[in-house]
């Protein structure tokens, strides 16, 4: 679906009406859930959300439907989170950093250079640590159905290639609102500038920020290459993406419906992460085709030396070092 200006205004108006209404409930107990996310329609989140809708409909015998609204159509990240908490939106997914003010222990997942590889990520997200972190949402009005991913984060900018920490000094870099991300770029001498993902392209285009940090899939799908010349594969952090629903609405479902939704969301997490792995490879090739200059082997050891220990120590001071030790032990 491509939205021109007129259709976007019409769709946005419809979205406003949807947010003002409760879940669509039929006479025979049928329910249509609404799900929003900020990523483009070409992203693995959208593909997986559509798969979830098909699976829920099939396995429930048509009792559960899922309407999916991509591109931040129902609001930016904080708006959609608050809409789910209020019960105006049923499900949403976005990057872990946008939840850390509600569920502070989730900050651990965003610590720089915490994860060694994808096997390490899977052992953490799909194991006891992931289960523990999902319970951190208790009392927030949200229930974490599963942990999807955004992926490995890399730096882009419009000024110069970034090969060493010195190259990033002075650059105004859009970050998420996560304290670990902000502190890491501050330590590197950059100017971290948190903002919603839906506002980022315009900020890059207008020069309000020099650069940003995201996975290659999002850099491609969001067309950031139109405003950014240089990509450095810093792989400085991995971003999980909690898929959340309204806790009270989930509790109100019958046992079979609730179990099916959770099972489908968690199977969707495994599918989405596998799909993202494939697209990370193809997206990098396409970014080169679009003219981006890629620094494949920046001095990650030097970046790690500056940010890893102090940011992890800061987390440990606030929340204790137990979680970090458990994650390190899962490597």
Predicted regions and their residues:
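N-terminal secretory/targeting leader peptides
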Residues: 2-3, 7-22, 26-120, 128-129, ...
């Amino acid at each position: 679906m491509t939205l021109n200006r007129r259709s976007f205004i019409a769709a946005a108006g419809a979205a406003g009406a949807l947010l003002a209404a409760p879940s669509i409930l039929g006479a025979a107990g049928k329910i249509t859930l609404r799900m929003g996310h900020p990523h483009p329609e070409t992203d693995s989140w959208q593909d997986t959300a559509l798969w979830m809708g098909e699976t829920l409909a099939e396995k429930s015998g048509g009792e559960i439907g899922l309407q999916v609204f991509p591109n931040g159509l129902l609001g930016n990240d904080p708006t959609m989170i608050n809409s789910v908490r209020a019960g105006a939106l049923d499900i949403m997914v976005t990057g872990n950093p946008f939840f850390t003010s509600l569920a502070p222990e989730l900050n651990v997942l965003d610590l720089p250079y915490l994860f060694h590889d994808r096997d390490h990520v899977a052992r953490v997200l799909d194991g006891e640590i992931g289960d523990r972190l999902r319970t951190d949402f208790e009392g927030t009005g949200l229930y974490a159905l599963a942990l999807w991913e955004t992926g490995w984060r890399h730096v882009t900018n419009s000024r110069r290639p970034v090969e060493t920490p010195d190259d990033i000094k002075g650059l105004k870099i859009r970050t998420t609102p996560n304290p670990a991300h902000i502190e890491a770029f501050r330590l590197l001498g950059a100017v971290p500038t948190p903002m919603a993902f839906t506002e980022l392209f315009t900020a890059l285009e207008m020069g309000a920020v020099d650069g940003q940090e995201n996975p290659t899939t999002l850099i491609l799908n969001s067309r950031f290459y139109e405003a950014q010349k240089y990509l450095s594969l810093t792989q400085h952090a991995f971003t999980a993406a909690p898929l959340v629903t309204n806790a009270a609405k989930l509790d109100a479902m019958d046992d079979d419906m609730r179990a099916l939704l959770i099972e489908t969301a968690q199977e969707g997490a495994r599918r989405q992460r596998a799909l993202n792995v494939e697209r990370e490879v193809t997206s990098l090739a396409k970014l080169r085709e679009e003219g981006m200059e890629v620094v494949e082997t920046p001095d990650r050891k030097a970046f790690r030396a500056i940010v890893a220990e102090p940011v992890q120590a800061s987390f440990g001071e606030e929340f204790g070092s137990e979680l970090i030790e458990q994650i390190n032990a899962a490597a």
